[in-house]
Amino acid sequence: MVTIRLARHGAKKRPFYQVVVTDSRNARNGRFIERVGFFNPIASEKEEGTRLDLDRIAHWVGQGATISDRVAALIKEVKKAA
């Protein structure tokens, strides 16, 4: 099953997440099909905290991909801000 979820990157105590489309059987930070955005939970006010390619996310959902709870909350937040 294809899923859209967060992959953790960054340093210790400084997380940075990439929003990726991947097979649900792959490891959290393992192989992915496509990167569709990023999320920086500790971004300063002058840095961009979240960027999502909503068109590609809609494409993958149309193909049957499921969305993780956290990514769904990020999508809702981005749409509200736009």
Swiss-Prot record:
GO molecular function annotations of the record: endonuclease activity; structural constituent of ribosome
Question: PROSITE patterns, from UniProt?
Answer: RIBOSOMAL_S16
What's a single GO BP term from this record? translation
Gene Ontology CC terms: cytoplasm; small ribosomal subunit
Keywords, A to Z, come to: Endonuclease, Hydrolase, Nuclease, Ribonucleoprotein, Ribosomal protein
> What are the cysteine partners in each disulfide bond?
none
User: What's a Pfam family this protein contains?
Assistant: Ribosomal_S16
Family to which the UniProt record says this protein belongs:
Belongs to the bacterial ribosomal protein bS16 family.
What is the annotated role of this protein in its UniProt record?
In addition to being a ribosomal protein, S16 also has a cation-dependent endonuclease activity.
Q: What is this protein called?
A: Small ribosomal subunit protein bS16
Q: Can you name the source organism?
A: Salmonella typhimurium (strain LT2 / SGSC1412 / ATCC 700720)
Q: Which gene encodes it?
A: rpsP
